[in-house]
Amino acid sequence: MIAVSFKCRCQILRRLTKDESPYTKSASQTKPPDGALAVRRQSIPEEFKGSTVVELMKKEGTTLGLTVSGGIDKDGKPRVSNLRQGGIAARSDQLDVGDYIKAVNGINLAKFRHDEIISLLKNVGERVVLEVEYELPPVSVQGSSVMFRTVEVTLHKEGNTFGFVIRGGAHDDRNKSRPVVITCVRPGGPADREGTIKPGDRLLSVDGIRLLGTTHAEAMSILKQCGQEATLLIEYDVSVMDSVATASGPLLVEVAKTPGASLGVALTTSVCCNKQVIVIDKIKSASIADRCGALHVGDHILSIDGTSMEYCTLAEATQFLANTTDQVKLEILPHHQTRLALKGPDHVKIQRSDRQHPWDAWASNQCGVHTNHHHNTYHPDHCRVPALTFPKALPPNSPPAMVPSSSPTSMSAYSLSSLNMGTLPRSLYSTSPRGTMMRRRLKKKDFKSSLSLASSTVGLAGQVVHTETTEVVLTADPVTGFGIQLQGSVFATETLSSPPLISYIEADSPAERCGVLQIGDRVMAINGIPTEDSTFEEANQLLRDSSITSKVTLEIEFDVAESVIPSSGTFHVKLPKKHSVELGITISSPSSRKPGDPLVISDIKKGSVAHRTGTLELGDKLLAIDNIRLDNCSMEDAVQILQQCEDLVKLKIRKDEDNSDEQESSGAIIYTVELKRYGGPLGITISGTEEPFDPIIISSLTKGGLAERTGAIHIGDRILAINSSSLKGKPLSEAIHLLQMAGETVTLKIKKQTDAQSASSPKKFPIPGHSGDLGDGEEDPSPIQKPGKLSDAYPSTVPSVDSAVDSWDGSGIDASYGSQGSTFQTSGYNYNTYDWRSPKQRTSLSPVPKPRSQTYPDVGLSNEDWDRSTASGFVGASDSADAEQEENFWSQALEDLETCGQSGILRELEEKADRRVSLRNMTLLATIMSGSTMSLNHEAPMARSQLGRQASFQERSSSRPHYSQTTRSNTLPSDVGRKSVTLRKMKQEIKEIMSPTPVELHKVTLYKDSGMEDFGFSVADGLLEKGVYVKNIRPAGPGDVGGLKPYDRLLQVNHVRTRDFDCCLVVPLIAESGNKLDLVISRNPLASQKSIEQPALPSDWSEQNSAFFQQPSHGGNLETREPTNTL
């Protein structure tokens, strides 16, 4: 019963066969048209009459393969009634059945009898010139039932033709002007074998040469003069099936096709209502399925030619489709109905308005009118689409679509300026492109010293826009390729004075799915090769070459609207949404979010629909989606609501003043500072947190440093951008990375708050002496902290990093480093920081710097001890005179090391240690602790003579320099009411995390063993950390005697820096060293002690095994991997 009612609701959609097209000959091309057509064509009205000259060459004794009927003694004028398959006339692709022959070699046939015409054609000679008249193809107008789309087709010449006949073209009489129309496709020819082109299609361009405004003769000449391979831009028609859009149940679609021709549909499987169903996955452009307009991506295939697909596999369904005859009957459930079943849980309700969308109303306008909705793009969901967004196709039997010559805008529909562009073009194509290029060059020149992304200009319809660029990587699809087409200069060989534009994006192609590309975007470079100084043909060739590797990288320039940029308050943003294409926004829930708090936009994809509006910014609050409030929605629910939206998405946004970079709205002063470091430090310390939208603050300046000397940077200033990279929505670690990669010239965008804002700001930046930063300044020591509760003794600060050290080039030793701690005294207790060095090392001299802020090591206090320590202050016990004397001593030692060429390594050690410890502290410690009195990376700035870090050189018996790197001290957050169990747990976790690990530098000279002809050690690449490490050491060999240990990292080999090398580069250096080998190595003592505790057997030292070696946890998670090399 269900099946019966199911069938009764099916509607029938019938498509005519493509052979019923008025431009298509019969398959054999041997039958003349019927008598009715012959009588109708006896006289062509003057306004529909076209003419051309056909030149044929034949050898003596051969015929043209042409059958002519008519004459003065017959009914009608001489006309072509048949073209023999394979004959000269047929292969010329200039004649069609039904053409009238007016003259042969200048001889008018108006008064010739039929037999005289035949005799003339036989005896005319080798060169035959025919004057031919034909009926102009009818005009096809885009309306409610037909839409235009374009497709790019690449064909190879056969002889000197592509296997199709063209008619139409521009004419002096406007009533006779037509686009260049393909009226016949020769069976078996190149176009027929390729299968895309059908009679009635319009030829828009050949190898980028636009045919708009060209005559028929000029179009023929362009086709003849192009190369053996040409790319043709074809426009075809797709019918709009209202019955599909309004259907409430299954449909029976009948599609007629030529036997053996492909329908152009790719199938896949999906799950609907817990059952597997066969679904249309892709539809090939300009295929029969595309042109009929009844099939869409996502439609469920219920049956094929009466065979149910309920229990069929994908392979079986594909085979059924391939075996169909000239009449295909498909029972489908349209995709707009299937989406209802595929939607998420019912607790999310979305009600859509029945009002007409802007592009629906605009679709009925003339195709040459420009649109202000610059995000309108075609999607299969739309039953009607805007003109010139190139929707889907016309039924094969429809008359060839044409642009009416009488319409002043219709002919410009094919011009570049009338394309419906997603990007607002900088100017119309007719304006001077050199001016655009000059503005672009000036913009690039100014960009170096300015943080504005681009200067504002006026786009279409007077809208203010600015340009931005982005890089897009596309992976080709087997069916649709990349899915983009370019529009360039008039002549393919002409050098482009402005970049080519994207003129078409195919639906459901990689170009559309990436969500970044839109029609009208300028293609600046293809695979890194600029397009501005090349020809359009070269640009197209780059795209074709990329299709071989199925990957292309495009640099795109696009426009971002900025006519309306809300500075604060609540407003609505409407974004067009396409199926399977994301809007480009990422929403997140702050860790401190409470019920009723909004979600935050944490990322906006560059080039996406959301980005191009120019109104959305990182940090904006998302209040509602399509009038569904998100106050109590989780982030997952909000994402689901976004995904279920269709066609048009309405977002309710709230922008706070503190999230605005505008001076007028925020009341702040915003300016740009450019610093040239000339190899030195910047002299600034930045502070922040790992929360994306917490500010990055300048917390201290080095006295007399570069930043302080400018006079434009002050403590408390907020950094908005570093070298044009905005810090909005980025954590402190990202800002650190940007500073490290900044190079010699660093451009900072600074926001200086007003006094009122500074006073009322809830976030307080650390002041010198209480900052959680490592500085290289020489400020006065901080005052001793007053006794009080623990929340006062351990002030709340934010983690920070001294950019003066972070700015040094390169990455140092890839390990975590330990601390030579200072001594502190409290209430009669003396505590030392935990020292990992051996007793022998502790006897060496070590600097004890002046403390600026108090650090508190793990001292194992009991509950009572903790209570007692809250009532007493911590007093630093270092002697200032001794410290000053030791600073002078170690300053000389550092200078000595610099003269030996080791200063770069020291700086790298500092930088890497800083980054490692900072990131570890910020992530792990923040995970362990909670509460408002949390302080991360709290440490006193050290004297500049110590390069901003505590550094100790330890005299060893081998006279090798030993360098120990300090970690940052961390204050322990606590509340008075914390329980002892929690304190013990936190102390234990902090002890495990913050256990210091020293690093040693050694210079080793080895002499080759004369007996073994090697240096007695093997090396291996690091697995998790780059670099080359000592793996095994032969007992009593040169390496063992010289003091090498497993896990030693080779920093230099014979004075060649090998920090970034692998075994393939290091082994040849060692092999070329002869009998003497000079090494500079870095060592983690823990790894060496571990290797001593577990010595390798003598027989194991050179084994080439595949095992991975992992260093102990305090050694930076070092692992080595094959290949190993015995040296």
Swiss-Prot record:
SMART domains: PDZ. Its main location: cytoplasm. InterPro entries: GRIP1/2 (IPR043545), PDZ (IPR001478), PDZ_6 (IPR041489), PDZ_sf (IPR036034). Residues 752-802, 840-865, 942-980, 1108-1127 are annotated as: Disordered. GO terms for cellular component: cytoplasmic vesicle; dendrite; endoplasmic reticulum membrane; glutamatergic synapse; membrane raft; neuron projection; perikaryon; plasma membrane. Palmitoylation of isoform 2. Expressed in brain. Isoform 2 is the major isoform in brain. Expressed in oligodendrocyte lineage cells. It is a peripheral membrane protein. It is found in: Cytoplasmic vesicle; Perikaryon; Cell projection, Dendrite; Cytoplasm. Residues 840-856, 947-973 have a biased composition (Polar residues). The modification Phosphoserine is found at residue 43. It comes from the Eukaryota. Keywords: Cell membrane, Cell projection, Cytoplasm, Cytoplasmic vesicle, Endoplasmic reticulum, Lipoprotein, Membrane, Palmitate, Phosphoprotein, Postsynaptic cell membrane, Repeat, Synapse. GO terms for biological process: neurotransmitter receptor transport, endosome to postsynaptic membrane; protein localization; vesicle-mediated transport in synapse. Residues 53-136, 150-238, 252-336, 471-560, 572-657, 672-754, 1003-1085 form the PDZ domain. May play a role as a localized scaffold for the assembly of a multiprotein signaling complex and as mediator of the trafficking of its binding partners at specific subcellular location in neurons. Through complex formation with NSG1, GRIA2 and STX12 controls the intracellular fate of AMPAR and the endosomal sorting of the GRIA2 subunit toward recycling and membrane targeting. Interacts with EFNB3, GRIA2, GRIA3, GRIPAP1/GRASP1, PPFIA1, PPFIA4, FRAS1, PTPRF, liprins-alpha and the C-terminal tail of PRLHR. Can form homomultimers or heteromultimers with GRIP2. Interacts with EFNB1, EPHA7, EPHB2, KIF5A, KIF5B and KIF5C. Forms a ternary complex with GRIA2 and CSPG4. Interacts with ATAD1 in an ATP-dependent manner. ATAD1-catalyzed ATP hydrolysis disrupts binding to ATAD1 and to GRIA2 and leads to AMPAR complex disassembly. Interacts with SLC30A9 and PLCD4. Interacts with BUD23. PDZ 6 mediates interaction with the PDZ recognition motif of EFNB1 and EPHB2 and with the C-terminus of PPFIA1 and PPFIA4. PDZ 4 and PDZ 5 mediate interaction with the C-terminus of GRIA2 and GRIA3. PDZ 4, PDZ 5 and PDZ 6 mediate homomultimers. PDZ 7 mediates interaction with PDZ domain of GRASP1. PDZ 6 mediates interaction with the C-terminal of liprins-alpha. PDZ 1, PDZ 2 and PDZ 3 mediate interaction with the PDZ-binding motif of FRAS1. PDZ 4 and PDZ 5 mediate interaction with PRLHR. PDZ 7 domain binds CSPG4. This is Glutamate receptor-interacting protein 1. It comes from Mus musculus. The gene is Grip1.
